[in-house]
């Protein structure tokens, strides 16, 4: 048996390589990171070959971040292009089996770290590549031959990235004419449960996986060739609500895979029992109550959203396999779904996108909304966002007037009720109690609004304040 300079075991899944224990970082938010699997004829593959283009591990400087691309070629009698993304998604699994090597995300968002301990035992990426290929061929026996090329040189990584994005785009377009109502089964994926134990990823024709790497066709291909693998069939069951995308079969699997933490998942709802979020999602949505709208921020965006929070902070709040009302992780291709958060207004509820994300998905944004959705070039805080939405006449602005009318009606009703209530006024004058003031200066312009709140007072005692002698 081949020996490797690090241990290999599923027990290392979920292992984090922290910054203080890191030798080098590959890809991630500070650089480029890519993984791609291509099906090739058997005679074009040199089995188990590892090629490194650019600096190898021993030539890298400790603590630095380097661009990174992994291109795997696979071959076999049963290998076909439909399996590429399925095999590609298992890269996350098998790399994390390697002690001291951390892998996060997918496709063009790959983020890896090699620990100091592991780097001290190997001076090249070659044994790492051989270990990953061994795991692939052991776990997925339909792969008969495999080779990999690692790129660490900036220009080469950029070149591979450009080619890969076209491949990803072609894959994603396959599901555009297929919808949830056209099929009898959906597919589930548990790949992210090593990092998010209660995550339940449901893939339907109208909802791509959170990582963006698995669509409905990919799930079908994976379940067919690897029935015991992380992608599996989900019987839809009965449709409970077409608008929210609630199915009995999805609810059953949600309860089972989350160990009872969740009993329902609504595929196309943002607020009511939303899809769980793992951490590998490409984009995170966030509710902005001040404008009653939803903003979205992608992983690559390094700035702040109008709520004063960046992607990494929101991702930490959203991920972990939880249902967090007000936050939602999605795959970018979900923007192209005709059922995109349809239970909560769809595109009419979207008020803010980073310009890089807006440009990327501009062809799916409804024509009448393209100039009404703000970017960081139009708005950097809540007040400027409000002004922009009012100026452009965004659909959410109409809800503000309705809310204000409702508040005014409630205030009038309260005034009438107070006026009608009998009150015994004391003979002597009295002073209403003053509101307690916050220490430390100005209150900061904080306004508290209670909506639909019922306050019951059992007894009110009004007493005359006596002067001290």
UniProtKB/Swiss-Prot annotation:
Superkingdom of origin organism: Archaea
Reactions performed catalytically: Co(I)-[corrinoid Fe-S protein] + acetyl-CoA + H(+) = methyl-Co(III)-[corrinoid Fe-S protein] + CO + CoA
Stated family: Belongs to the CdhC family.
Keyword annotations: Acyltransferase, Iron, Iron-sulfur, Metal-binding, Methanogenesis, Nickel, Transferase
Enzyme class at the top of the EC tree: transferase
Full protein name: Acetyl-CoA decarbonylase/synthase complex subunit beta 1
Assembly behavior: Monomer. The ACDS complex is made up of alpha, epsilon, beta, gamma and delta chains with a probable stoichiometry of (alpha(2)epsilon(2))(4)-beta(8)-(gamma(1)delta(1))(8) (Potential).
Gene name as annotated: cdhC1
Binding-site residues for [Ni-Fe-S] cluster, renumbered to this chain: 189, 192, 278, 280
Pfam families documented for this protein: ACS_CODH_B_C (PF19436), CdhC (PF03598)
Function: Part of a complex that catalyzes the reversible cleavage of acetyl-CoA, allowing growth on acetate as sole source of carbon and energy. The alpha-epsilon complex generates CO from CO(2), while the beta subunit (this protein) combines the CO with CoA and a methyl group to form acetyl-CoA. The methyl group, which is incorporated into acetyl-CoA, is transferred to the beta subunit by a corrinoid iron-sulfur protein (the gamma-delta complex).
Pathway the protein takes part in: One-carbon metabolism; methanogenesis from acetate
Keyword Repeat: no
EC identifiers of the protein: 2.3.1.169
InterPro entries: ACS_CODH_B_C (IPR045822), CO_DH/Ac-CoA_synth_bsu (IPR004461), CO_DH/Ac-CoA_synth_bsu_3_sf (IPR038571), CO_DH/Ac-CoA_synth_bsu_arc (IPR023432), Prismane-like_sf (IPR011254)
GO terms of molecular function: acetyltransferase activity; anaerobic carbon-monoxide dehydrogenase activity; CO-methylating acetyl-CoA synthase activity; iron ion binding; iron-sulfur cluster binding; nickel cation binding
One of the GO BP terms on file: methanogenesis, from acetate
KW Chloroplast (keyword) present: no
Signal peptide: none
């Amino acid at each position: 048996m081949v020996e490797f300079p690090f241990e290999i075991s599923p027990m290392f899944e979920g292992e984090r390589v922290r910054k203080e224990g890191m030798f080098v970082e590959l890809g991630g938010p500070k650089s480029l990171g890519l993984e791609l699997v291509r099906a090739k004829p058997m005679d074009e593959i040199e089995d188990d070959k590892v090629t490194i283009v650019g600096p190898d591990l021993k030539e890298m400087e400790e603590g630095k971040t380097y661009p990174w691309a992994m291109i795997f070629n696979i071959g076999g009698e049963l290998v076909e292009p439909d399996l590429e993304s399925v095999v590609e998604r298992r890269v996350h699994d098998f790399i994390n089996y390697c002690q001291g090597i951390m892998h996060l995300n997918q496709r063009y968002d790959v983020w890896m770290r090699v620990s100091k301990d592991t780097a001290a035992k190997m001076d090249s990426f070659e044994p790492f590549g051989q270990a990953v290929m061994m795991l692939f061929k052991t776990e997925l026996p339909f792969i008969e031959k495999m080779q990999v090329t690692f790129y660490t040189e900036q220009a080469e990584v950029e070149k591979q990235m450009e080619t890969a994005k076209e491949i990803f785009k072609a894959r994603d377009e396959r599901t555009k004419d297929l919808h949830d109502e056209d099929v009898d089964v959906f597919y589930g994926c548990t790949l992210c449960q090593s990092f998010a134990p209660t995550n339940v990823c449901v893939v339907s024709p109208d909802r791509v996986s959170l990582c963006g790497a698995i669509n409905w066709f990919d799930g079908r291909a994976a379940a067919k060739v690897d029935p015991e693998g992380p992608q599996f069939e989900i019987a839809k069951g009965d449709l409970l609500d077409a608008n929210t995308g609630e199915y009995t079969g999805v609810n059953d699997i949600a309860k089972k895979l989350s160990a009872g933490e969740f009993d329902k998942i609504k595929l196309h709802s943002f607020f009511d029992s939303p899809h769980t979020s793992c951490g590998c999602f490409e984009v995170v949505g966030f509710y902005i109550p001040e404008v009653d709208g939803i903003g979205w921020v992608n992983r690559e965006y390094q700035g702040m959203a109008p709520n004063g929070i960046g992607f990494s902070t929101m991702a930490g709040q959203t991920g972990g396999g939880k249902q967090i009302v007000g936050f939602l992780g999605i795959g970018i291709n979900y923007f192209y779904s005709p059922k995109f958060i349809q239970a909560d207004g769809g595109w009419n509820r979207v008020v803010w996108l980073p310009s890089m994300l807006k440009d990327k998905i501009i062809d799916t944004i409804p024509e009448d909304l393209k100039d009404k959705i703000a970017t960081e070039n139009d708005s950097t805080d809540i007040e400027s966002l409000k002004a922009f939405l009012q100026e452009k006449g965004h659909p959410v602005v109409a809800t503000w007037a309705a809310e204000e009318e409702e508040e005014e009606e409630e205030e009038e009703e309260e005034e009438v009720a107070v006026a009608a209530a009998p009150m015994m006024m004391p003979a002597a004058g009295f002073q209403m109690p003053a509101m307690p003031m916050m220490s430390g200066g100005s209150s900061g312009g904080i306004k508290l609004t209670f909506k639909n709140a019922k306050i019951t007072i059992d007894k009110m005692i009004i007493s005359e304040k006596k002067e001290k002698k």
